[in-house]
């Protein structure tokens, strides 16, 4: 009888699923507290909010591998509503929809999506390929280049009690600079507020 209990415990333990850690070295650190997190702690924290914004250093392969791991792992913990990518513009959305509706993926997926050369397909391709196989929508989250240039040339006038306050602009400029690792030229910063 004791052997049966041991066997049952071992079988049940084998059914427990724990996401594998991200396929990269280094530490996961909470930038607000400095606390080092395990992969499981990170997933537990990110599974709670309705929306998660994930960024990367655009040319860092480890960041992209971690993003793919995170997308796959969160999908096992909770339903995903959608995936929005800064790399996709509204004029590409119909192409994304066509690829999703096709019976088999095109041999040249980046070409079928009219993927922009500025976003290295070798790094972003695995994330896009995975997202296209999921039940949730893959959506464009950027503006077309013409729209961006129009905002830069003629920024809209914002209304609201605090929208134009210098303190708010200073905070927003700081966040924009931080989210781009301090790599944006100062001359581009004011236009980013548009």
Where does each model-flagged region fall?
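Short, well-ordered alpha-helix to beta-strand connector turns
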Residues: 25, 49, 78, 134-135
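Acidic/histidine-rich, surface-exposed loop or edge segments in extracytoplasmic proteins
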Residues: 47-57, 107-111
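Active-site-proximal beta-strand/loop segments in catalytic clefts of secreted hydrolases
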Residues: 55-57, 85-88, 141-144
């Amino acid at each position: 009888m004791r052997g049966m209990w041991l066997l049952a415990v071992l079988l049940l333990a084998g059914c427990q699923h724990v996401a594998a850690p991200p396929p990269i070295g280094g530490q996961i650190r909470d930038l607000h507290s400095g606390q080092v997190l395990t992969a499981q702690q990170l997933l537990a924290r990110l599974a709670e909010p309705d929306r998660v914004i994930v960024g990367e250093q655009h040319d860092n392969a480890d960041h992209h591998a971690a993003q793919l791991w995170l997308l796959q792992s969160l999908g096992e913990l909770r339903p995903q509503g959608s995936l929005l990518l800064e790399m996709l513009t509204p004029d590409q959305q119909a192409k994304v929809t066509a690829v999703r509706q096709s019976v088999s993926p095109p041999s040249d997926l980046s070409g079928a999506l009219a993927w922009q050369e500025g976003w290295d397909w070798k790094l972003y391709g695995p994330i896009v390929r995975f997202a296209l196989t999921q039940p949730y929508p893959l959506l464009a989250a950027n503006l077309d280049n013409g729209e961006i240039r129009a905002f830069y040339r003629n920024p809209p006038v914002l209304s609201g009690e605090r929208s134009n306050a210098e303190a708010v602009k200073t905070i927003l400029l700081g966040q924009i600079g931080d989210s781009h690792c301090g790599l944006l030229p100062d001359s581009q910063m004011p236009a980013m507020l548009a």
